[in-house]
């Protein structure tokens, strides 16, 4: 490991010791799978149907926190790439997403053992569109580089860069908090990665409000600060975010990136009764919502969707986009034709009455 990193970590340790002394003187997603072999054949020819169409609509980009990253307000979740969406299908999904204006892709080093990143890297190389694509990936869950220790972070980032076939990561998430590692050590490691040009910005996933506050205090010493937070948030799962986490995110100006935006597919209307459920992983997770509350939410989504001549999925994402600090919900597609409903959400403006109705039925 380059010498700059351990030197910086020693500086952090010194700051931590000084802070301790001062205080004493004054008396607070798909599970990881084994990697799958990578095909070597070229990408499928660009869909001729896409060549005859343009973007769905003109949508203003949104900025991610205090950064220069401007993104379409929908992040394409890549956890299904190489899993429920095979390699060729994944590439066609990416083509459709990009052609209709999408530029923000969310992945992780642990998704399908790194296969998701491999497919994204292959697509960017063949299409020559790396500069126009904002790539977010996460570290901390891959079985070869677990946790947020310095060595794990550096090795994980190097491996992601190789799979993505790029020199830099636009937005690096800590996939989960790691209570076994001092947060300042993890931040110092990312500082070195930023100085090296391998990472542009840092974000947090699945962090508590208290830990976000701690991280912001540490950033006052010159360490990198989080510019975004990713958390589970949708019409069926609200309380976790609509608490101290929302208050802290707003106070810190963090861009909020809700994952499971469609509640494992439930908010698309695919699972309306127990008869619609099957044995796949998404269906099993969605089963928790097949109840009276879920039926009320789907009925409201159907009504609002009819008023906008849209779909329940688009309305569910539009509801998120109307919430303060939400920049780009994360949603995935297992077929190319599903992409349109995801992107269409950014062009929908819900009325106050519609927002109140959706808020009420989902309480």
Enumerate the predicted regions with their spans.
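N-terminal binding-site loop/beta-alpha segment at the start of enzyme catalytic domains
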Residues: 2-133
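Beta/alpha (TIM)-barrel catalytic core signal, keyed to glycine-rich beta->alpha loops juxtaposed to Asp/Glu
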Residues: 4-7, 11-12, 33-35, 49-54, ...
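Short acidic capping loops at alpha-helix termini that bridge into adjacent secondary structure
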Residues: 72-73, 106, 128-133, 167-171, ...
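Active-site mouth loops of central-metabolism enzymes
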Residues: 77-88, 139-151, 180
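Short, acidic/polar
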Residues: 85-97, 148-163, 212-216
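Structural motif
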Residues: 100, 163-164, 197, 252
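A short, structured active-site edge motif that brings together acidic residues
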Residues: 131-143, 229-233
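Active-site groove signature of glycoside hydrolases
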Residues: 161-182
């Amino acid at each position: 490991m380059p010498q700059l990193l351990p030197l910086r970590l020693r500086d952090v340790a010194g700051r931590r010791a000084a802070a301790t002394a001062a205080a004493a003187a004054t008396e607070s997603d798909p599970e990881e799978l084994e990697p799958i072999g990578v095909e070597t054949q070229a990408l499928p020819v660009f869909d001729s149907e896409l060549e005859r169409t343009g973007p769905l609509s003109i949508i203003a980009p949104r900025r991610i926190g205090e950064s220069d990253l401007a993104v379409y307000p929908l992040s394409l979740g890549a956890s299904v790439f190489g899993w429920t969406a095979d390699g060729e299908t994944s590439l066609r999904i990416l083509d459709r997403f990009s052609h209709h204006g999408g530029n923000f892709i969310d992945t992780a080093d642990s998704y399908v053992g790194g296969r998701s990143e491999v497919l994204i890297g292959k697509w960017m190389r063949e299409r020559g569109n790396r500069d126009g694509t904002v790539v977010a990936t996460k570290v901390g869950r891959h079985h070869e580089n677990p946790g947020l220790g310095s060595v794990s972070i550096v090795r994980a980032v190097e491996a992601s860069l190789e799979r993505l076939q790029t020199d830099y990561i636009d937005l690096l998430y800590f996939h989960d908090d790691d209570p076994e590692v001092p947060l300042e050590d993890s931040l110092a490691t990312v500082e070195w990665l930023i100085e090296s040009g391998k990472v542009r910005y840092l974000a947090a996933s699945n962090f508590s409000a208290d830990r976000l506050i701690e991280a912001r205090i540490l950033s006052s010493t010159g360490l990198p600060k989080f510019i975004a937070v990713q958390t589970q948030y949708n019409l069926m799962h609200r309380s976790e975010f609509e608490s101290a986490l929302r208050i802290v995110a707003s106070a810190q100006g963090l861009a909020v990136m809700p994952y499971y935006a469609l509640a494992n597919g439930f908010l698309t209307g695919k699972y309306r009764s127990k008869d619609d459920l099957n044995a796949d992983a998404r269906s099993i997770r969605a089963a928790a919502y097949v109840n009276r509350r879920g039926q009320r939410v789907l009925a409201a989504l159907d009504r609002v969707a009819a008023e906008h001549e849209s779909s329940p999925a688009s309305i569910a994402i539009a509801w998120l986009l109307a919430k303060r600090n939400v920049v780009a919900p994360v949603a995935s597609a297992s077929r190319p034709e599903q992409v349109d409903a995801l992107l269409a959400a950014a062009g929908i403006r819900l009325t106050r009455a519609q927002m109140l109705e959706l808020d009420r039925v989902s309480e």
